[in-house]
Design a protein with these regions (language model features):
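Extended beta-strand/beta-hairpin segments
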Residues: 1-46, 57-150
Length: 150
């Protein structure tokens, strides 16, 4: 896998992927940026969220679970001093479907976290990662239950 990062101006860069996609990254105005895109460390979390969401949906579909939506909300803490790594990251999954079982969702999240999601497994080498999830019935906007994975 290869990517190319090109400086645009000030603290703005464009990242180009081998698959032909581009993404602008920029800093906050107080850091010399113009807020043209996410910060580079935000893209780490976005990529990790995409990786694990992909896995969870794929695993549920492969098991013929009636999943209709999957959202991952990630909260990460930055270290106060350089390098400002993520010492703690929390993944909150909101998985929606018709008659989804808690056990199906928990298993899919566990497999992603422990076996398939390269990004979260790499981050887990330096950060304490926790997960929890909600299962929602399709057609309802009510939070059903929040489950913690142990």
């Amino acid at each position: 896998m290869k990517v190319r990062i090109k400086w645009l101006e000030n603290v703005a860069f464009v990242g180009e992927s081998e698959s032909g996609h581009a993404m602008v990254m920029d800093g906050a105005p107080e850091g010399g940026g113009r807020n043209l895109g996410p910060r580079p460390m935000e893209t780490v979390l976005i990529g990790t969220g995409g990786c694990t969401a992909y896995d969870v949906v794929h695993i549920l579909r492969k098991g013929r679970a009636p999943v209709t939506d999957c959202v991952v909300e990630i909260a990460a803490e930055r270290a106060p001093q350089d390098p400002q790594v993520f010492p703690r990251i929390h993944f909150h999954f909101i998985v929606t479907g018709r008659g989804l079982k808690r056990e199906q969702v928990e298993r899919a999240i566990h497999l992603s976290a422990e076996k398939y999601c390269s990004a979260s497994i790499m981050l887990g080498k330096t950060a304490a990662i926790t997960h929890d999830f909600e299962v929602r019935e399709a057609g309802y906007e009510i939070r059903d239950t929040r489950y913690e994975i142990r």
